[in-house]
């Protein structure tokens, strides 16, 4: 058994122990790709485009209530009358700006990707986190690195 499969099986066990369906599904899909022999063709595409696909799917999910008519201009204007909505608005802007720098860091430093991926795997499997961490984590890492370089 090769190292990637063994590593994935170990992570699959963690996924089952943590009862994390997203992690389990992701690993089963990756193992299936390897099992049928498409890994050389498919995995590089997933690796290079997967984050963008994921962001697109999340964006679709966030915009679905607008498309369904559940959220309209009235709800938007009404929500901006509360302090909580303004905090959410500022948080959304802040996180999007942080994540932008994360894309830059992941593209320029492949070694960072391994550490961030492992941190995300630990958070997802052990603490029931959600796997949006690598992009935000990379953005935070980028910001901290730039601050350290500045001083």
From Swiss-Prot:
Entry keyword set: Cell membrane, Membrane, Transmembrane, Transmembrane helix
Q: Does the keyword Cell membrane apply?
A: yes
Question: Where is this protein found?
Answer: Cell membrane
Q: Does the keyword Transmembrane apply?
A: yes
Coiled coil location: none
Superkingdom of origin: Bacteria
Q: Which family does it belong to?
A: Belongs to the UPF0756 family.
Protein name in the entry: UPF0756 membrane protein GK2737
Per the UniProt record, the source organism is Geobacillus kaustophilus (strain HTA426)
């Amino acid at each position: 058994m090769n190292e990637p499969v063994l590593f994935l099986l170990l992570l699959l066990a963690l996924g089952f122990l943590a009862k994390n369906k997203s992690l389990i599904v992701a690993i089963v899909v990756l193992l299936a790709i390897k099992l049928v022999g498409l890994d050389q063709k498919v995995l590089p595409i997933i690796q290079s485009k997967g984050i963008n696909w994921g962001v697109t799917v999340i964006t679709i999910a966030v915009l679905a209530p607008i498309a369904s008519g559940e959220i309209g201009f009235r709800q938007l204007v009404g929500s901006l009358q509360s302090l909580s909505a303004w905090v959410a608005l500022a948080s959304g802007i802040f996180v999007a700006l942080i994540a932008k720098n994360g894309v830059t860091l992941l593209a320029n430093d492949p070694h960072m990707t391994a550490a961030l991926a492992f941190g995300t795997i630990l958070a997802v499997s052990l603490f029931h986190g959600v796997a949006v961490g690598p992009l935000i984590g990379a953005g935070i890492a980028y910001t901290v690195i730039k601050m350290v370089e500045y001083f």
